[in-house]
């Protein structure tokens, strides 16, 4: 028994944890690239949860050689129109902000120039939440070992998933309350409509009865 326990103790980290890191880690980073014609505007929208760090890097390749006074304006806003980041004549840079509420955020690139100018190539890489954290810097500050850094990252990722499930549960409860409220209103409206129809039918019966009596068609 003692001979077999030694190698097992030296196996290292849990294979399941490493598998989660391999599956969830690389797939969480996504760069978007597109072509931006001159005098055009393209926007990207994304819903992001509350109190999350959002970081991004962008690079705009100008293939015109500076002809036509080509300039590109980058602006990031929330659904209320508040400007979170703005850059005139953007070429390459980074940005960061923290969300205050769950909201829809919009990243817009607008190109302005004159003449026939080739399309610009825009590359945008946005990260938020766990993806936006600089774990290399955290490791230096807290003097963490590589395995401890990966475990910290896995812990943050698990917390993020739990928060997502909690938000979805809250949304489900809100939708259920809305459905129940709607069903109650429909029921009350149906009852009101039924009484209106009964009242209208009763009025028509009495009206026709008086009409026929006036015409002496009935006694």
UniProtKB/Swiss-Prot annotation:
Q: Where is this motif: COPI vesicle coat-binding?
A: 211-219
Q: Which domain of life is it from?
A: Eukaryota
PROSITE patterns recorded: GOLD
Q: How does it sit in the membrane?
A: Single-pass type I membrane protein
Q: Which GO terms describe its cellular component?
A: COPI-coated vesicle; COPII-coated ER to Golgi transport vesicle; endoplasmic reticulum; endoplasmic reticulum membrane; endoplasmic reticulum-Golgi intermediate compartment; endoplasmic reticulum-Golgi intermediate compartment membrane; gamma-secretase complex; Golgi apparatus
Compartments it resides in: Endoplasmic reticulum membrane; Endoplasmic reticulum-Golgi intermediate compartment membrane; Golgi apparatus membrane; Golgi apparatus, cis-Golgi network membrane
User: What is the role of the protein in this entry?
Assistant: Cargo receptor involved in protein vesicular trafficking and quality control in the endoplasmic reticulum (ER) and Golgi. The p24 protein family is a group of transmembrane proteins that bind coat protein complex I/COPI and coat protein complex II/COPII involved in vesicular trafficking between the membranes. Acts at the lumenal side for incorporation of secretory cargo molecules into transport vesicles and involved in vesicle coat formation at the cytoplasmic side.
| Entry protein name | Transmembrane emp24 domain-containing protein 10
Identify the species of origin: Bos taurus
Q: What is the lineage of its organism?
A: Eukaryota, Metazoa, Chordata, Craniata, Vertebrata
| Gene symbol of the encoding locus | TMED10
């Amino acid at each position: 028994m003692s001979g077999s326990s030694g190698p097992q103790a030296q196996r290292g980290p849990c294979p399941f944890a490493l598998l989660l890191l391999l599956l969830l880690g690389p797939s969480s980073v996504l760069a978007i690239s597109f072509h931006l014609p001159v005098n055009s505007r393209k926007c990207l929208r994304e819903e992001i949860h509350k109190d999350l760090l959002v970081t991004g890097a962008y690079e705009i390749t100008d293939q015109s050689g500076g002809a036509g006074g080509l300039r590109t304006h980058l602006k990031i806003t929330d659904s209320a129109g508040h400007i979170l980041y703005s850059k005139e004549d953007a070429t390459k840079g980074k940005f960061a902000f923290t969300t205050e509420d769950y909201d829809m955020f919009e990243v817009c690139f607008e190109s302005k120039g004159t003449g026939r100018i080739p399309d610009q190539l825009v590359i945008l890489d946005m990260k938020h939440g766990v993806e936006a954290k600089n774990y290399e810097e955290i490791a230096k500050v807290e003097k963490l070992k590589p395995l401890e850094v990966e475990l910290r990252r896995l812990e943050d990722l698990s917390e993020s998933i739990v928060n997502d499930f909690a938000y979805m549960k809250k949304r489900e409860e809100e939708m259920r309350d809305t459905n129940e409220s709607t069903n109650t209103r429909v029921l009350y409206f149906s009852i009101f409509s039924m009484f209106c129809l009964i009242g209208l039918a009763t009025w028509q019966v009495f009206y026709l009865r008086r009409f026929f009596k006036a015409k002496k068609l009935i006694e």
